[in-house]
Regions:
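Accessory terminal helices/loops
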Residues: 2-22, 193-208, 215-300
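Active-site metal-binding loops of divalent metal-dependent hydrolases
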Residues: 60-62, 86, 116-117, 145-147, ...
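Divalent metal-coordination and catalytic microenvironments
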Residues: 47, 59, 85, 97, ...
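Pocket-forming structural segment of enzyme catalytic cores
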Residues: 135-154, 168, 178-179
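Charged helix-capping and loop-helix junction motifs
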Residues: 182-191
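Active-site-flanking alpha-helical
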Residues: 92-93, 97, 152-153, 176, ...
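Conserved beta-strand hairpin/beta-sheet module of binuclear metal-dependent hydrolase folds
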Residues: 23-76, 153-167
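Active-site HxH/HxHxD metal-binding segment of metal-dependent hydrolases
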Residues: 55, 62-142, 156, 161-163
């Protein structure tokens, strides 16, 4: 009897320790502000494992600002420079960053991007291709529209259950990117099929969004002006608006589920959104609604 109870206590202790480990361990996301003094309000991100020995450096477009923000040991942990798309304000720093990492003996550093239009690209992932970064699982979700080589990176930590998605200029908080190389139909597919399906509906509420720019205040202003015009009409937007009034950084605060509740580009069948694009009868296609929303946003 003593032996059985002893074993039971040991098993209980093991389960408690395991649960505590899941609660205390975490993946790390370090946002790096770039071009904030010149109006670009870009983000680069250092995504790291729990022990910070392995990292991805996402969209390090401005090397001087990135090097200033990161410690030498953080740079030495970088296994890959990763781009969400080829625009210079996301991939323009690839060469200088790789050179610096090579000086730090990161001889095998890779450059992962959606096409060879990003300087120094060594790997081009296919849609839904997966990578491992230590214990982290990373799924590449190709989202052509803003550019045809746009890729979002969905990250999950199976130990802590933390989840994040790095969306570049495809999905912003309460908005989306311009359709420079695509159509409204492609953006609808990117946001409402590829991202949502790639993450999976059971994970939407726990997946934090890390966009390529801090455009949230501008996006909220548009949604309030053009769609949900009065407080109380959309509680999720009210909450986001209040947060924006009190904070400058929204990256990593809101989830995909939040986006589904206030982002008009992800609420194309909402009668209020239809009214905003002068389609009260709901006769327009989703692609047409997306195009009209983007046209309205571009005019602000």
């Amino acid at each position: 009897m003593f032996r059985v109870n002893s074993i039971a206590r040991q098993l209980g202790s093991f389960k408690s320790a395991s649960k505590l480990s899941q609660q205390t361990r975490k993946m790390h996301v370090k946002p790096v502000k770039m071009r904030w003094l010149t109006g670009g309000v870009n983000y680069s991100y250092l995504l790291s494992t729990e022990d910070k020995t392995k990292s991805w450096l996402i969209d390090p477009a401005e090397p001087a600002e990135v090097f200033s923000a990161l410690k030498t040991e953080e740079l030495m942990s970088v296994e890959a420079v990763v781009n969400t798309h080829h625009h210079y304000d996301h991939s323009g720093g690839n060469g200088a960053v790789v050179s610096r990492l090579t000086e730090l003996e990161n001889a095998d550093v890779q450059v992962i991007s959606g096409s060879h239009n990003s300087p120094g690209t060594t790997q081009i992932p296919k849609h839904l291709q997966e990578y491992a970064l230590g214990d982290l699982k990373i799924r590449c979700i190709r989202t052509p529209c803003h550019t045809q080589d746009s890729v979002c990176y969905y990250v999950s930590d199976p130990m802590s259950q933390e989840k994040a998605i790095f969306t570049g200029d495809t999905l912003f908080i309460a908005g989306c990117g311009r359709f420079f190389e695509g159509t409204g139909e492609e953006m609808d597919v990117a946001l409402n099929r590829r991202i949502l399906d790639g993450v999976g509906n059971s994970n939407w509420a726990t997946t934090k969004v890390y966009p390529g720019h801090e455009y949230t205040k501008s996006n909220v202003k548009f949604v309030r002006h053009a769609v949900y015009k009065t407080a109380g009409e959309n509680a999720a937007l009210d909450k986001l608006e209040k947060f924006c009034n009190e904070n400058d950084v929204t990256a990593g605060v809101f989830t995909l589920q939040d986006e589904l509740e206030y982002n008009p580009f992800m609420r194309l069948d909402d009668p209020t959104v239809r009214d905003a694009v002068k389609d009260p009868q709901g006769s327009l296609t989703r692609a047409q609604v997306t195009d009209r929303l983007r046209t309205l946003k571009n005019k602000m």
